[in-house]
């Protein structure tokens, strides 16, 4: 009987891996193959409180491998839940996995009743059982009490408690150690295997993707990202130099050519696929004003079709909607309709109808226009 069970498990492993490879679409690199074997050991292991940690640099095929694994699990009728720390990260996760994804906060927290304090959230009940929870961009998961309105104040503690409170649930953390850790720490605690093992008593399975995929080798963006990562690992940076020639995905343009180049990108690829990255909010405001006036020909500061990002958790405007506990910092909203304007206490507001990524219903809210031109990440209390 033991030999039969062992043989059966080997056959299941091989079958599962074969389907993942078909969905992946390429031959596995050595580190991808090692990651696949480690995941299979985790998946079919018997340890009830085990966790899988998948780390990988840009261009190593991490997202493609995760997407293939997730969709293979679904084909095997295994329950999965996809999560990410921010609304934008959840949108990206959903995009490459072709499955719904949610923010961690919206999945694990529930608002307390009015007597206990408006805007105070406790850890919710986990109704999932026999489920694998995949969390992308895990480097952003903090342990500090940055927002005491949520649970214990430690997102990592609450996430692990929530997942393993459900029967036979397990967690897969996905991230890149080269990305910035949470504010106030030098490393990302959610990506440190030894820390997870000691702090939570978990059985940790770990894989690290380091091989750059062949189809990514000609990418100038990945070349420079790898170069910067190697420079950081070598010690303090004396001077940061980028190589911008000889790559199909990098075009160097002067300031005088930028508007024309942006206009062409908007027409060819769409606004969602065209972004300007700035070093400060001050410069972002200048680019925003120039693009709106000279490319989009939008005279108003705020109008229908605009995309805005929420910069502070809001517990008020979602209260009247059944499926919206709160509107989270980092959520992306599209302005569907603009209503009346109002000035109050020296600030400028507009009433708007908004659709927020991840929710089916639109909401009505007053939007503070001053944040659109603020040079800070959010308005200060002053």
Say what each PLM segment does.
Residues 32, 86, 280:
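Short, conserved phosphate/pyrophosphate- and ester-handling motifs at nucleotide-, phospho-/glycolipid
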Residues 36-37, 41, 46-237:
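ASCE P-loop NTPase helicase motor core
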Residues 26-33, 146-154, 252-257:
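Conserved phosphate-coordination/catalytic loops
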Residues 28, 82, 276:
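Conserved SAM-binding loop
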Residues 3, 15-16, 39-40, 47, ...:
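Conserved helicase motor core of P-loop NTPases
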